[in-house]
């Protein structure tokens, strides 16, 4: 990498890097995109499960949302390359350190490509 490229790289904002990551994920060849809804049961609310899921999803480069449900469960809707989505599903089986996951249900849905980020959803909407 040349000096000019390094200098440009250092000047890039996180949002630009994030946008490049989004494009990279969407452009991956030979990857099948899937959509999975995940329901996580156990001690999963009040233990930073949503924020930890958002961080893990962003790290993996998958898109969708995570939210608490009124019944004490956490729901995740995720889209992206199959291998990366499967890695997030596997992560949900243990979650963050304070969580105690007892059961994970997953159901595959038709991929829509509607998301361009991964967000924490709250009662008032996505944040």
State where each predicted segment sits.
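Intrinsically disordered, low-complexity, mixed-charge
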Residues: 2-127
């Amino acid at each position: 990498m040349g000096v000019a490229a390094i200098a440009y790289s250092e000047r890039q904002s996180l949002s630009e890097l994030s946008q490049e990551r989004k494009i990279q994920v969407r452009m991956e060849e030979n990857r099948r995109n899937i959509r999975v809804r995940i329901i996580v049961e156990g001690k999963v609310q009040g233990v930073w499960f949503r924020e930890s899921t958002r961080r893990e999803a962003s790290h993996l480069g998958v898109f969708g949302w995570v939210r608490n449900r009124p019944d004490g469960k956490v729901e995740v809707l995720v889209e992206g390359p199959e291998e990366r989505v499967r890695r997030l599903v596997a992560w949900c089986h243990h979650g963050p350190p304070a969580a105690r996951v007892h059961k994970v249900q997953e159901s595959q849905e038709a991929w829509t490509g509607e998301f361009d980020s991964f967000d924490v959803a709250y009662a008032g909407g996505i944040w």
